[in-house]
Amino acid sequence: MVRLGGVASVSHMEVFQGLETLFRRRGIDLDWVLYSDFDMMAEAFVAGDIDLAWNGPLGYVKIKRLLEEPCRVIAMRDVDINSTTHFIARSDSRIVTVEDLKGMRFAFGSRSSE
């Protein structure tokens, strides 16, 4: 039995059902463990309460920061394959190219990721 954590959301139900079907077709029993937010799911993953976490980029960063050992991404939805990222800087900023970010701290995430 694989315990897969996810954040409970009506918009995620179709994805949850699709993942459950995918696992069952491969002979893997799946137990969904739903959380009210990404922080709770990250803590559960680090504690070993769930085997996998279904989250976005910021959820990954949260888990990676909490873990003392590396974690890895093992799957991505096909709808995310062609995603692009845009970096936007103020016109009066000294940032003109990605190289200008060297030595700076910044964060980004998708609008659907907490």
Regions found by a protein language model. Give the residues of each.
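Ligand-binding "clamshell"
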Residues: 63-75
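Well-formed, non-transmembrane alpha-helical positions, independent of function
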Residues: 43-44, 62, 100
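Alpha-to-beta junction loops
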Residues: 46-55, 69, 104-107
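Alpha-helix capping/helix-boundary segments
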Residues: 40, 59-60
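Conserved beta-strand segments of alpha/beta enzyme cores
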Residues: 29-31, 72
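Bilobed "Venus flytrap"/periplasmic-binding protein-like clamshell domains
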Residues: 2-26, 35, 83-114
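Short helix-initiation/N-cap motifs at beta->coil->alpha
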Residues: 31-43, 96
